[in-house]
């Protein structure tokens, strides 16, 4: 799915606009998978281009929900980095997290709670590292457990 997505994003605006029917989408997808060496009849792709249409079209509001998943993932990776930068999973750090985030529930703005916890705004770089879109050298990012190489991949 990721390689196919990259092929779509490599198209010019005019090239993408010309792929304007389901048949053309299917033909482009088939050609792209073949060009990538991934067209294998015995193993069809799990995710097709049109599987994500609901995320980005229509009045459903799902795109906002999808964005919130990404935002949550970013907060997860940033808070992991905070723990690593501050001595790991210690009792004091756990108490600090409980006092500044968990115990507040819905009584405060979540951005304010996070700033109270981390003493800074969240940084997207840790999510980019976890997704393989940046390497750890950016701004001396700390080693984040749970990255693919930690899982033997």
Describe the function of each predicted region.
Residues 1-153:
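C-terminal, non-catalytic "cap/extension" segments appended to globular domains
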């Amino acid at each position: 799915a990721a390689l196919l997505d990259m092929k779509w994003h490599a198209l010019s605006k005019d090239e993408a606009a010309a792929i304007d029917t389901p048949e053309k989408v299917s033909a482009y997808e088939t050609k792209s998978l073949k060009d990538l060496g991934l067209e294998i009849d015995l193993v069809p792709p799990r995710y097709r281009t049109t599987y994500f249409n609901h995320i980005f079209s229509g009045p459903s509001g799902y795109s906002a929900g999808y964005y919130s998943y990404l935002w949550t993932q970013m907060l997860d990776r940033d808070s992991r980095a905070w723990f690593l930068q501050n001595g790991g999973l210690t009792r004091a750090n756990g108490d600090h997290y409980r006092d500044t985030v968990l115990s507040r529930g819905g009584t405060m703005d979540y951005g304010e709670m996070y700033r109270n916890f981390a003493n800074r705004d969240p940084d997207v770089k840790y999510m980019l590292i976890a997704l393989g879109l940046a390497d750890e050298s950016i701004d001396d990012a700390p080693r984040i457990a749970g990255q693919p190489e930690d899982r033997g991949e």
